A protein has these predicted regions:
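Membrane-proximal interfacial segments on either side of biological membranes
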Residues: 1-68, 79-181, 193-297, 304, ...
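Tandem-repeat architecture and repeat-register "anchor" residues
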Residues: 186, 299-301
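Nucleotide-sugar donor-binding loop of glycosyltransferases
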Residues: 71
Length: 361
């Protein structure tokens, strides 16, 4: 069945009648015994569906159950991006070792072959990614599954867009071993800011250390491309300025990365200018909080207007809420901010100015 699939794929490969591929096969004695089969395949131009490549070159051999691709290169006919691959497959040990470097449109190629989207539909590449990837895989009996897999590499790309929001470039280093992954030196650039940091996933636990100065629209666009249902601001909150966000800590995805999702410990720092809450405008807002399991500890929430400010500290421990509130805003603004949480009795007339300090549980 697998051979039939391979032959089916090969049958789709076309070339011009005037420039057919050239194949040279050499048979020789192998020093270890048996026969060594060498193959040299060259093609000026090949086409597979929508994929068109030129300068195709493959040089390899087979001996003692080992397939060796010494040189495997090609260029994309439209972008001139290249692919360079070296590969060794040991059929006895069921191992595969590879090293690939590419500036070709690999994502478009893969979609053309498997007919499936490999990146969120909200993301569009405006330039081709550059990829370097090496790795080793050990397969189970009959090559039915992978027993061990490790890979490492780096990737970068120029301009791309998410939900129409244009980014300048992105890059990172990455590695993977049997379900555990590491993404380091993550750097995403936007005309209005950047997103940088590292993410590590080990045994169902994801450790995060990221810093963002991306504009709000760009940040929400990235989040929506990953989790569209969750990435939205509360209706009462409007952010017109560009925020700065720092997140450090860990979350648990469960054994086998199958959930349930749970926050272990996260530290969050955020600041923003020109923000509205319940229609009340603030010049700036800053917050610092820590999430531990289901509890939340807010060590700073500072909302600043030209005519006053609000400070809040508090903790939510699952069932208990402890807080301290200080404000010199006009009482009518506090009533607006409270929304449905609090209403002033009709017979009570609010003063024009007041200083408020509240501590409660």
């Amino acid at each position: 069945e697998q051979l039939n699939q391979v032959l089916n794929y090969m049958d789709r490969v076309k070339w011009p009648d005037a420039s057919p591929p050239r194949l040279i096969v050499n048979l020789s004695d192998d020093p270890k015994g048996g026969v060594r089969i060498g193959m040299d395949l060259q093609a000026p131009f090949l086409r597979y569906g929508k994929i068109m490549v030129r300068d195709f070159l493959f040089n390899g051999d087979y001996a003692d159950s080992v397939i060796m691709a010494k040189r495997f290169t090609m260029r994309d006919a439209e972008t001139a991006g290249f692919v360079s691959l070296s590969l060794q497959a040991d059929l006895k040990k069921r191992t595969l070792i590879w090293d690939v470097r590419s500036t070709a449109p690999l994502v478009s190629w893969a979609v053309a072959i498997v007919d499936e989207a490999l990146v969120p539909k909200e993301m569009k590449f405006l330039s081709e990614p550059h990829v370097q990837l090496s790795g080793r895989a050990v397969f189970s009996e009959n090559w039915e599954g992978v027993e061990h897999l490790n890979a490492l590499g780096s990737g970068s790309m120029g301009a791309f867009s998410v939900l129409g929001e244009k980014f300048q470039r992105a890059s990172c280093d990455f590695s993977y071993e049997n379900g555990n992954f590491y993404v380091t030196d993550l750097d995403i650039r936007h005309p209005g800011g950047s997103f940088s940091g590292k993410v590590m996933g080990v045994d169902g636990e994801i450790k995060i250390d990221v810093h963002s100065t991306l504009p709000m629209k760009a940040m929400l666009g990235m989040a929506r491309s990953i989790a569209p249902e969750d990435a939205k601001l509360p209706p009462a909150l409007e952010i017109r300025g560009d925020p700065e966000l720092k997140v450090y800590g860990s979350v648990d995805m469960g054994k086998g990365w199958k959930g349930p999702f749970q926050v272990d410990r996260l530290q969050i720092e955020a600041s923003v200018t020109d923000v509205f809450y319940q229609g009340v405008e603030f010049v700036s807002a800053a917050a610092r909080a820590e999430l531990i399991g289901r509890s939340v500890n807010v060590t700073q929430l500072d909302l600043v207007r030209d005519d006053g400010r609000v400070k809040l500290e508090g903790s939510y421990l699952g069932t208990d809420l402890v807080f301290t509130l200080e404000s010199n805003l006009k009482p009518e603004l506090l009533e607006t901010l409270a929304g449905n949480w609090f209403s002033v009795p009709e017979h009570l007339q609010l003063p024009e100015k007041a200083v408020l300090w509240v501590h409660g549980r």
